Amino acid sequence: MSSFLPEGGCYELLTVIGKGFEDLMTVNLARYKPTGEYVTVRRINLEACSNEMVTFLQGELHVSKLFSHPNILPYGATFIADNELWVVTSFMAYGSAKDLICTHFMDGMSELAIAYILQGALKALDYIHHMGYVHRSVKASHVLISADGKVYLSGLRSNLSMISHGQRQRVVHDFPKYSIKVLPWLSPEVLQQNLQGYDAKSDIYSVGITACELANGHVPFKDMPATQMLLEKLNGTVPCLLDTSTIPAEELTMSTSRSAANSGLSESLAPSTPRTSNGDSPSHPYHRTFSPHFHHFVEQCLQRNPDMRPSASTLLNHSFFKQIKRRASEALPELLRPVTPITTFEGRQSQDHSGIFGLVTNLEELEVDDWEF
């Protein structure tokens, strides 16, 4: 992964492709002038940030410099330009895993593609946990895929150190800041906010939720009020993979799309309008069967008792990953077809700041502001 010069003049800002961080962050596609490479530039208005926000950002930058792993998205450059903090990363041409399920795999991805994606994320998590941190924001939008099929975990902003005064703490109690978008992925013990606290096993629960998200095409507990979601999780409601083993046979005869699915909680699915226009009755999108290994993997991740969840290193040896025979960079581009990475851009920035002609059509599908690099 490239490193870049920490000088604003080295970057030609092309178009705004996202916003974030309480609308104080602008995400630009940019061209790195020395090489012509396309990059993502995250610009944060420091003058508008509160002291708490600045401290939060300092923690993120500290973590980014501390971590070095093939599956963690590195920051190519960080520097101050005028009143802005600039964070430069390589452009992820496949976008995030969430982008893929939102635009191409709306009823879920193939099991093998999910295995490659989760393996990359777990390798990153294993490293983060060994470094004494909890990620606290594992979800599909924070799993990015480069043009050559490599998997990167992002979202370092939410990482929390479990080391205090030189000693590793057994648990921590801090609730993630600015975490409203990540609530469906958070474990019961994080949401509970009690004296028992939580540890790195809370990330494993999030891996299980992310597995369901990738397989079902939507995150469990989707659109559920926060209070109800908390009650469901504390009462032991366990999401699952939607397939022939978890959906009643009579419901599989209905033509149902993910828009009618109810959060992957293995309850009744209401019928929706058939997808074909020629009068044929299409098959149910969840009329498929995931392997017992995949089901067991998810069940292990979503154990209510965090002590019963395997560690990231243990999960990497799970039978679910035995189906992987090649490197992700070799296999993922094939498994993601017909999706092709965004590698070419036409035109230049217009005077009315509307962006690059011909580019927005491609980029508008990417929820870049949710990548949180």
Swiss-Prot record:
Q: Which Gene3D superfamilies match?
A: Phosphorylase Kinase, domain 1, Transferase(Phosphotransferase) domain 1
Compositional bias ranges of the Polar residues kind: 255-281
Look up the record and give one Gene Ontology term from the biological process aspect.
protein export from nucleus
Q: Between which residues do disulfide bridges form?
A: none
What InterPro entries does the entry give? Kinase-like_dom_sf, Prot_kinase_dom, STRAD_A/B-like
PROSITE patterns given in the database record: PROTEIN_KINASE_DOM
- Is tRNA processing among this UniProt entry's keywords? no
Chief subcellular site?
nucleus
Q: Where in the cell is it found?
A: Nucleus; Cytoplasm
The entry's free-text remark on domains says:
The protein kinase domain is predicted to be catalytically inactive.
The Swiss-Prot or TrEMBL record describes its family as follows: Belongs to the protein kinase superfamily. STE Ser/Thr protein kinase family. STE20 subfamily.
Q: What's the protein here called?
A: STE20-related kinase adapter protein alpha
* Phylogenetic lineage: Eukaryota, Metazoa, Chordata, Craniata, Vertebrata
